[in-house]
Amino acid sequence: MAYTLPQLPYAYDALEPHIDARTMEIHHTKHHQTYVDNANKALEGTEFADLPVEQLIQQLDRVPADKKGALRNNAGGHANHSMFWQIMGQGQGQNGANQPSGELLDAINSAFGSFDAFKQKFEDAAKTRFGSGWAWLVVKDGKLDVVSTANQDNPLMGEAIAGVSGTPILGVDVWEHAYYLNYQNRRPDYLAAFWNVVNWDEVSKRYAAAK
């Protein structure tokens, strides 16, 4: 079962002006496609070729040593981006405010004190991730936490590989290819804009499944 590039659940220009159409098209058809292609190449002839990518990245300790680096980077990239596209949309909040509601909002308030405090902690994790990587909202032991990972690592890989653990329910890509065309080196501006396109309905579904 070869991995395939997932279709976006919206048009490339759907997230404008916050994330521009050209960035979305290149990010999806070039960068993500490359991760898919390289993951498939590394998986050829292995017993792991039929695993869903989320399961594969949780079992990297079982992967042959000569495949581990390629799969950590490329299966990780495929998993990360597949989630990234899903947790974005045109903003779906109550009364026009793009923020979560219900159990997820209650859990955020419990874990971080307020939604604004959570946003600040998440942005700080993303801003201070040196070089390329991701910031994540994860569920761990039934509780929410904010973590970050380098390169294409994912919390599902576990602490031994990624340095953190948990089930991610929200993630933001801070590789420069995710924002450079529109924001150049202004990562904080990109992160501030990101909140306008988070699909909290999708994040809430992921929280309900992970808690």
Curated annotation (Swiss-Prot):
Belongs to the iron/manganese superoxide dismutase family. It comes from the Bacteria. Keywords: Manganese, Metal-binding, Oxidoreductase. Mn(2+) binds at H27, H81, D173, H177. Destroys superoxide anion radicals which are normally produced within the cells and which are toxic to biological systems. Its EC number is 1.15.1.1. GO terms for biological process: removal of superoxide radicals. Its cofactor is Mn(2+). InterPro entries: Mn/Fe_SOD (IPR001189), Mn/Fe_SOD_BS (IPR019833), Mn/Fe_SOD_C (IPR019832), Mn/Fe_SOD_N (IPR019831), Mn/Fe_SOD_N_sf (IPR036324), SOD_C_sf (IPR036314). Binds 1 Mn(2+) ion per subunit. This is Superoxide dismutase [Mn]. PANTHER family: 37S RIBOSOMAL PROTEIN S26, MITOCHONDRIAL, SMALL RIBOSOMAL SUBUNIT PROTEIN MS42. It is an enzyme of class 1 (oxidoreductase). It comes from Deinococcus radiodurans (strain ATCC 13939 / DSM 20539 / JCM 16871 / CCUG 27074 / LMG 4051 / NBRC 15346 / NCIMB 9279 / VKM B-1422 / R1). It catalyses: 2 superoxide + 2 H(+) = H2O2 + O2. The lineage of its organism: Bacteria, Thermotogati, Deinococcota, Deinococci, Deinococcales. Homodimer.
